[in-house]
């Protein structure tokens, strides 16, 4: 009987996928996996996988399948046939894509162009962070090392296209560049080229996998692109693809020896970027500073002080206001002992939304190095997060197969979105289909599905059974939002002494984060998708919206592109007076819910 009861306690083994997961483990069914590198494959499916929505049909334009590189010869395969074994495998993230247009687009979403940023730069007021004057005027600094001629053991080899210079000189500056990782390879692609399957450059790393990457929108130009990428080893690469120069940051984990889970340039900054690590740390780096062995700047090392600081939602191990800014890190914060899954900067360039594997969403004022609010998932960890273009809403996705919409001004949950059958891996807003009243966002997940969602506040209704108690609870949360919005009393002068000088009593008094209880599902509005579609046979890892298309990438390297409906339909849809989505929201939730239900029913 004991054996029978244990069989119900043990969780089922995780799903096993043929190429990437077996590649990470080095074996499948106890046998070494023969992975042979091939060229990228570009296909144009005819009439396959259209996306039907109110404004028209999104047609699948092409499917670019990235080649999976073979393991490095020095990488011994780990034979592990037991699916329940606890031996850790190298972290993987699937294929993530960074897109950049080096020339300003002719059109920008009107919803985005109305936003006005008034926040000061990160680190403003600290003279130690004032950048040194540039000798060459407006000329951008580049990394020092040539990655093609590199003798580093971290980089295995670099393959460049034989006609790369010619292709770069002849291409339109309005075309899209794409940067994508697949296992230990990192590819630079020109999506505007007829030979888009032929990378301009491919970097093969020795053992580390690139898990995340980002492009600096401030410094980009036709002759310069600043990119940072984080690896499974914790090392970070600053890469300039046009000159093929690079620099290695956090070398051998000298600052943080944990895999980089997400990385983003700090909005408006030319040099500073933020990286989250699997050990629960958020680190701000300067691409032009050298590394040094990191020691927390905490003067009071007593057991009482350390115990008090560990209970805080944010431990400032090095403040951005520290005068010690000769080397990296610029700032280092500890949020938890568990993995940070993802983070996103708000459009006002002041707030930061962070999701963790412990199931928490933490909203920070990162300029003040403070956690304002802590929300919890319904079940399991949170995986992805994004802000609406106007900064009013935050959307998260996680292991509970749900998406959750949070109102940032009101500091409360707005709705839960049910439609995925597995973990939600990525979420993003479509700024070209958003206006002041209606929002469009999309999500992808391990169920191989792409879902699109429309919502407005007027179309969301709580369940009638709990409306009375819900109204009472809303007033309570609204009161707490005023508490969450309050201004802190500490001045810039006091903070210049560094948060690391706080004592135990100071830690007890400064924990001002509002911890919101979990809202029961029975009291929460439920939003169905307007479109749900299985778009492949392997989990989807990334989702991006462009002016003329929707793009996804998958675990096994498929980058798919859907063209938006033709211009006439889109122009009509973007007109607020004739928008089907706005009309539906004005009419109430019935028509929108009915549309979503009929869409789901036909799948």
UniProtKB/Swiss-Prot annotation:
One of its GO terms (biological process) is carbon catabolite repression of transcription. WD repeats lie at residues 255-295, 335-376, 377-416, 419-463, 535-572. Keywords: Repeat, Transcription, Transcription regulation, Ubl conjugation pathway, WD repeat. It comes from Neosartorya fischeri (strain ATCC 1020 / DSM 3700 / CBS 544.65 / FGSC A1164 / JCM 1740 / NRRL 181 / WB 181). Belongs to the WD repeat creC family. This is Probable catabolite repression protein creC. Residues 577-603 have a biased composition (Low complexity). Residues 470-515, 567-603 are annotated as: Disordered. PROSITE patterns: WD_REPEATS_2, WD_REPEATS_REGION. Interacts with creB. Signal peptide: none annotated. Component of the regulatory network controlling carbon source utilization through ubiquitination and deubiquitination involving creA, creB, creC, creD and acrB. Required to prevent the proteolysis of the CreB deubiquitinating enzyme in the absence of carbon catabolite repression. CreB deubiquitinating enzyme stabilized in a complex with the CreC leads to the expression of genes such as those in the proline and quinate pathways. One of its GO terms (cellular component) is nucleus. Transmembrane segments: none annotated. It comes from the Eukaryota. The keyword Transcription regulation applies.
């Amino acid at each position: 009987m004991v054996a029978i009861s244990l069989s119900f306690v043990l969780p089922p083994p995780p799903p096993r996928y043929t190429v990437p997961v077996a590649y990470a483990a080095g074996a499948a069914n106890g046998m070494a996996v023969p992975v042979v590198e091939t060229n990228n494959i570009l296909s144009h499916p005819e009439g396959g996988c259209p996306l039907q929505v109110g404004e028209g049909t999104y047609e699948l334009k092409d499917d670019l399948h990235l080649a999976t590189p073979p393991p490095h010869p020095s990488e011994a395969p780990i034979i592990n046939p037991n699916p329940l074994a606890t031996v850790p495998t190298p972290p993987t993230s699937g294929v993530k894509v960074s897109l950049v247009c080096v020339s300003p687009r002719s059109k920008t979403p009107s919803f985005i162009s109305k936003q006005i940023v008034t926040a000061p730069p990160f680190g403003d007021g600290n003279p130690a962070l004032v950048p040194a004057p540039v000798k060459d005027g407006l000329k951008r600094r580049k990394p020092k090392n040539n990655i093609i001629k590199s003798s580093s053991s971290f980089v295995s080899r670099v393959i460049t296209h034989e006609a790369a210079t010619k292709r770069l000189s002849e291409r339109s500056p309005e075309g899209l560049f794409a940067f994508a990782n697949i296992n230990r390879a990192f590819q630079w692609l020109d999506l505007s080229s007829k030979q888009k399957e032929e990378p301009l450059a491919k970097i093969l790393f020795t053992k580390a996998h690139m898990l995340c990457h980002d492009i600096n929108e401030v410094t980009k130009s036709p002759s310069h692109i600043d990119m940072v990428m984080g690896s499974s080893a914790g090392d970070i690469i600053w890469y300039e693809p046009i000159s093929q120069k690079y620099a290695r940051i956090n070398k051998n984990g000298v600052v943080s020896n944990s895999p980089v889970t997400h990385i983003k340039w700090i909005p408006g900054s030319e040099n500073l970027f933020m990286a989250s690590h699997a050990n629960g740390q958020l680190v701000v780096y300067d691409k032009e500073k050298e590394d040094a062995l990191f020691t927390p700047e905490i003067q009071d090392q007593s057991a009482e002080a350390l115990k008090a600081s560990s209970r805080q939602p944010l431990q400032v191990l090095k403040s951005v206001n520290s005068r010690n800014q000769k080397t990296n890190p610029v700032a280092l914060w500890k949020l938890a002992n568990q993995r940070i899954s993802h983070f996103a900067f708000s459009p006002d360039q002041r707030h930061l939304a962070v999701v963790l594997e412990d199931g928490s969403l933490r909203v920070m004022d990162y300029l003040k190095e403070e956690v304002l609010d802590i929300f919890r998932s319904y079940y399991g960890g949170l995986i992805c997060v994004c802000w609406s273009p106007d900064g009013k809403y935050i959307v998260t996705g996680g292991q509970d197969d749900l998406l959750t919409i949070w109102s940032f001004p009101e500091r409360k949950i707005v709705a839960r979105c049910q439609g995925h059958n597995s973990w939600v891996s990525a979420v993003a807003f479509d700024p070209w289909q958003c206006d002041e009243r209606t929002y469009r966002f999309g999500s992808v997940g391990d169920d191989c599905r792409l879902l699109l969602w429309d919502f407005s506040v007027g179309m969301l209704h709580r369940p009638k059974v709990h409306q009375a108690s819900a109204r009472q609870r809303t007033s309570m949360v609204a009161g707490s939002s005023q508490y969450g919005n309050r201004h802190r009393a500490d001045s810039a002068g006091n903070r210049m002494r560094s948060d690391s000088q706080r004592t135990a009593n100071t830690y007890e008094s400064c924990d001002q984060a509002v911890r919101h209880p979990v809202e029961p599902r029975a009291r929460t509005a439920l939003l169905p998708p307007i479109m749900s579609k299985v778009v492949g046979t392997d989990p989807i890892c990334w989702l991006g919206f462009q002016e003329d298309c929707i793009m996804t990438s998958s675990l096994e390297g498929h980058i798919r592109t859907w063209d938006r409906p033709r211009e006439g339909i889109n122009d009509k849809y973007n007109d607020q007076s004739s928008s089907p989505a706005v009309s539906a929201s004005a009419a109430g939730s019935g028509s929108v819910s009915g549309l979503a239900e009929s869409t789901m029913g036909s799948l």
